[in-house]
Amino acid sequence: MKVEKRQLQFDQKLEEMGMRIKDADQLKVKEDVFDEITLLALYRLVHKKWLSAIGGSISTGKEANIFFGERGNLNVAIKIYRIRTANFNAMSEYIVGDRRFSNVKKNRKDLVFAWTKKEFSNLSRAQEVGIPVPEPLVWDRNILLMSFLGEGERPYPQLRLAKIMDPESVYKQLIECIDTLYNKAELVHADLSEFNILYGDRLYLIDMGQSVTRDHPNALRYLMRDIKNINRYFRTRCAIQEDIKIFSKITHLDTIEP
């Protein structure tokens, strides 16, 4: 009964904002997601006409939940970073050393806000150089709105779950993406794997909140880790290049300092 009452109160709050609720039975109240700060950010996005409807959950990650949404006739993805349960230490590793966020206060709320802004910025830089990523639309506090990648209301599958007819071609595209990201966008994804790549009409890199600039103290280490992850996944699926050869071609360095 308490859960149903809380669900009703939550639905009423969203409706008061002017937001239409889709698939209400799938939109379960999660106290660690829809807190007062998140509801306020949602209200601001609805008020500014960025959102008109919210639907069911698309995915639940370590730090964020993603929901299906609508902006008029446009399908969007609503990424909400959880403030109460965010892994402060894990996030700090990627924020500290990033010159763009050197003034961030060391508390959980401000770190999550900075992280959301950071992902928006990283996606924008990647998109500018032609990397296939979800289009970043707007961010507010701990909420990031992006274009929805999928067919109808069904998201594209992660690479690990997709049926790929030509894995060698996909592998080459990914190595090219890593190169372009590093040399043109001056970014390193820093968590690239078969879990953070979607595959539909083409491949897409996602989850770029942790991505760092090329001058980050750990950028080269993260770059090598990305290369190793992609090689690990494709090793039994097609011919691959050696880790160090890819690394050297991208960075023009022969080795990486431990």
Predicted feature descriptions by range:
Residues 1-17:
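Long, low-complexity intrinsically disordered regions enriched in Ser/Thr/Pro/Gly
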Residues 6-7, 29, 36-43, 47-48, ...:
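Intrinsic disorder/low-complexity detector
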Residues 17-18, 22-30, 222:
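Polybasic/polar functional segments that serve as interface/processing modules
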Residues 22, 29-155:
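Conserved ATP-binding subdomain of kinase catalytic cores across diverse folds
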Residues 82, 150, 194, 199, ...:
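Short, glycine/acidic-enriched loop or turn micro-motifs at the edges of active sites
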Residues 107-135, 139-140, 156-190, 195, ...:
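Conserved kinase catalytic-core helix
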Residues 154-159, 213-216:
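Short small-residue beta-strand/loop micro-motif enriched in glycine and branched aliphatics
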Residues 170, 182-189, 200-258:
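C-lobe/activation-segment region of protein kinase-like
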